[in-house]
């Protein structure tokens, strides 16, 4: 059991948990900043303002919400 503890200690020293990126750093988790960056679907070139959605072709390229 002490070998496992030594191995765990060595692994934590070589690869600390602070080196792992947090999920909060992802832009998808920050919708307010996404809207400020002007990357919302309403500004997508394939957004249909009449139907207020994107065509099925544009959905493959990141335009949401998709028309079904």
UniProtKB/Swiss-Prot annotation:
Tissue: Expressed by the venom duct.
Signal sequence segment: 1-19
Disulfide topology: 53-67, 54-63, 59-66
UniProt region (Disordered), positions on chain: 22-46
Propeptide residues, chain positions: 20-51
Presence of keyword Disulfide bond: yes
GO MF: ion channel inhibitor activity; toxin activity
Any matching Pfam family: Conotoxin
Subcellular location, principal: secreted
Bilayer-spanning residue ranges: none
Gene Ontology CC annotations of this record: extracellular region
Modified residues (4-hydroxyproline): 65
InterPro entries: Conotoxin (IPR004214)
Alphabetized UniProt keyword annotations: Disulfide bond, Hydroxylation, Secreted, Signal, Toxin
Domain comment in the entry: The cysteine framework is III (CC-C-C-CC).
Protein name per UniProt: Conotoxin Mr3.3
């Amino acid at each position: 059991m002490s070998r496992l503890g030594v191995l765990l200690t060595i692994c934590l020293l070589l690869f600390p948990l602070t080196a792992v990126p947090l999920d909060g750093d992802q832009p998808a988790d920050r919708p307010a900043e996404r809207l400020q960056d002007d990357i919302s679907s309403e500004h997508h070139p394939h957004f249909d303002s009449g139907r207020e959605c994107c065509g099925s072709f544009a959905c493959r390229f990141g335009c949401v919400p998709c028309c079904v």
